[in-house]
Amino acid sequence: MVVVMESGDVKAPFRGGSNEAGRSDYGATFYKVLLNDLIPMVDRTFRTLSDRDHRAMAGLSWGGHQTFDVVFTHLDLFSYAGAFSGAIFGLDVNQTYGGIFSRPAEVNSRLHYLFLGCGSEEDMGTGRLVADLRRAGVRVDSYVSVGTHHEWLTWRRCLRAFVPHLFKR
């Protein structure tokens, strides 16, 4: 397995704001860099299996938000997704990403594994999102790191829970 850790904190003009449009501007140029530059460079440099069945993406905090933005708009490239304390606030599972979550059979057949984790002492909305996805019929695995906050120990535990489920198909 090749693990690539890139910072999604790509600097670009950022207008800010608390609404979803303003928040989505933050690091927005990262998506182009990831899809057009980073993935092709990794596939050229390392011996990879470059199909979607052998590609996963996960992120912590804002990287969890970016993971959802990338994976659920590029299911042709990814089949595993993980968000560790993902900043995925107020996601309307019926509307977002072209309404993909309102088609659970499609999500469940295309996404081999979906994981959401968080610390027990933080409120990133992970529990609500897991419940909403399950109510919609989407298969999702969840993990709560007992006694931890929005911190590295949480994310290390999430990684440990996530990785064993990758590339089992």
Language-model region placement:
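Non-catalytic cap/lid and distal C-terminal segments of serine-dependent acyl enzymes
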Residues: 1-169
